[in-house]
Curated annotation (Swiss-Prot):
The record marks G117, L118 as: Cleavage. GO terms for cellular component: autophagosome membrane; cytoplasmic vesicle; microtubule. Keywords: Autophagy, Cytoplasm, Cytoplasmic vesicle, Cytoskeleton, Lipoprotein, Membrane, Microtubule, Protein transport, Transport, Ubl conjugation pathway, Vacuole. Residues 118-120 form a propeptide. The C-terminal 3 residues are removed by ATG4 to expose Gly-117 at the C-terminus. The C-terminal Gly is then amidated with phosphatidylethanolamine by an activating system similar to that for ubiquitin. This is Autophagy-related protein 8C. Ubiquitin-like modifier involved in autophagosomes formation. May mediate the delivery of the autophagosomes to the vacuole via the microtubule cytoskeleton. Gene3D superfamilies: Phosphatidylinositol 3-kinase Catalytic Subunit, Chain A, domain 1. InterPro entries: Atg8-like, Ubiquitin-like_domsf. It is found in: Cytoplasmic vesicle, Autophagosome membrane; Vacuole membrane; Cytoplasm, Cytoskeleton. Belongs to the ATG8 family.
Amino acid sequence: MARSSFKLEHPLERRQAEANRIREKYPDRIPVIVEKAERSDIPDIDKKKYLVPADLTVGQFVYVVRKRIKLSAEKAIFIFVKNTLPPTAALMSAIYEENKDEDGFLYMTYSGENTFGLFV
C-alpha cells in the first residue's frame, strides 16, 4: 500500500502528539484517518480526520463515509485497514486496538472496488 498522504504531510512527532492529545481529551473516541485508495474512481472525501465513537461499528462508519462522499445507494464502497476488509460488525475500538499506527491514528482506505480482495 502506498504511504498515506497524511503521513507525508505531517511528521511522525506531530502526528503522535496530536493523537495523544485527542485520546487524553476524548478517551471514548478513536482518531481515524480516511483516505481514498489510489486509482479508485470513487469521489474524494472532503475531510480525512475523524473522531469516531469507540462503540461505533465498522458498518456504521462506512455509512458515515458514504454520506461524506455523497455516494449513491447502488454504488459499492469498500473500507480497508492494512489492505484487509474488516468485519462490518466489528467495533471501531477493536479495529483500532488491533491496527492502530505507531503514531496513534487508525488509517483506513476506501475504494469503489474490492481492490485487495482479502476478507478477515
